[in-house]
Amino acid sequence: MNDLYNGDRAVRKNAAVEMTAGLTDNNHILTHIFNTLAADKMITDRLRKHPSWINAMNLHNELQNKTVDTLIEAVTSRYDIVHRYYLVKRRLLGLDKLEHFDRYAPLPSLPTKEIDWRSCRETVLRSFAEFSPRMAEIAEMFFARNWIHAPIGEGKRGGAFAHPCVPEVHPYVLVNYTGSLRDVSTVAHELGHGVHQFLAAAQGHFNSDTPLPLAETASVFAELLVFNSQLALLTSDEERRAFICQKLESIFATVFRQTAMNRFEQLMHEGRRSHGELSSAKLSEYWLTTQRAMFGDTVQLGDDYGIWWSYIPHFLSTPGYVYSYAFGELLVLALYGLYRQEGEPFVAKYLELLAAGGSRSPYELLQPFGIDLDSPAFWQKGLTVIEEMLTRVE
């Protein structure tokens, strides 16, 4: 998958071809697995009297069906943002058309300077401190007390995460730091989780865990703080444009892509319940239909891309989960917009939100901000922030 981010188009194309071949070789068993687990969920939902395939996840997330429907409708109504962005990317890459393996191609002017660990630490803590000295103070403890492990080492697992442990102790953070701008963002993201977990620990074992839709609030907000600090340091228009584009693609991955995946899941589960076992061709049809709705005609999605539904683990392990990413990202973008409007009064309310953990429902936790999760206008606030970023690079 890493080769899909390679600057060499031939490498990206070869990676896509190999990915398709690998999935195709396992097509029969993957189709069987998807059908079996979809049928298992259908039976469980029937026994538990859930009125729809998504109801169980909504109940787990402490959200009303209306709220989730409003979110999905808001995002799909703004797929035009995706269409406009990839027209920009095609122009910046100098291509006549974008194939699906060009989606993650790096822009030539993206800053490549390596950032050492000390500079990363200073950037993150400065960004946090400009927002809230308390937030920076907590994050500083992760560095000073060795609550964060960053070096790459033999036998160390990949990726990044924050683990809350138990309320009586403190969280730990793991990252694999290589010095890229993206890695600095990852450190900010995981420290956002760490700060959230540290503050929420006072709620104890039963209430410190945050409801899933709000679990990414602190992490994505922390990313935004650092992104704006990094952007301010770039002096070249080309570098600034490329850096904003990279951020837009990250947002697209959590807002629009996850929503399109939700649309695929709906077709799959409803199709399984209405028509019985689904063929691989039918699942690929569902996938291409929902992906093409998102990309429009700005990215060419050939039939070879049709099998790519079969590598998404969330469809199997946590049905209905993916909309939570879009929920969290748009919520943070809207909260950041409120911060820009309110300034200092916002900060105290925000830290109280983090410290509340899971002691109240999402609706109750967001009440101090005057947020109505059932209002289409609320979700449009976050989408408007995305559009404003897009306008800066068009």
Question: In which residue ranges do the predicted regions lie?
Answer:
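Active-site recognition of the HExxH zinc-binding catalytic motif
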Residues: K49, T178-A200, S219, L224, ...
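Secondary-structure capping and boundary motifs in well-ordered enzyme cores
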Residues: Q64-T67, D116, G153, R157, ...
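Conserved helix-loop functional segments at active or binding sites
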Residues: R126, E130-E137, H163, H193, ...
